[in-house]
């Protein structure tokens, strides 16, 4: 990344475009973060510079500027533009045909499809900070996200402010959807998180795990073998499976996914009072129909307020939907870190890593 007058320390640029779409870069000596401002302020790159590894998954669909599809999918446009990376999901997750308060919310809501305003808050060798803002179209919500780097820290710090601008109570499913892929992801990877229970969604015919719960973390019945198996151990693409699972009753809000062989990993930490659940989307080559047709190998580890990914009405029914009061403001923070270690016992919201 070119930044005039500074070639080391923290750097930031809002001067770049890709295929006509605005992008921002944040960079320090440890990591480089790319942000697609014209689509959801997605994080499309998270590269750990000492290893030249971008943890985020690239899907078979390339990053494209908006285009006219042959016809509209009932679920909406999320998959048309899903190139991988890390999206913010709001005001709902998954897809359901029924509207909420008169509006169809579509697959994973609209926050990841809208263009965001962006401005620099701080730009010094010691710290850079970018503020993004959006007001949703079909929902009475506004979202402000501030992303920051500090000198010599392999950590992206995120502060968020979500506002219900309406005079009515408004229910949401809110979460972050970072997908992890090759060249980092492989069968030497394992996920660590302080959960007590696991629930498995009835998601796809090629699911590996027995749907239901609550299973004692991390052992879950493998429905092919009939035996209990550690669900946090990443499996090879030859497994030909796809599942969505929920890690519940978290003691703290954090996870780490570590390649124990290469001693490299990626983790997140967040406020558990807001994001109470950790979802894991496991695609081990088994999503053999639309939109992946057996081509994909990835996992996503997703802090969420609620579950399952089946539209807001289902989260209301199971009592996990986040009910925002009229004019309510929610402020919270998260961090995403890269590290070199064989095993992790904790990720802190200050970007710290405790290793074993």
Where are the language model's segments positioned?
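Surface-exposed acidic/polar loop and edge beta-strand patches at domain peripheries
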Residues: 1-157, 168-171, 175-356
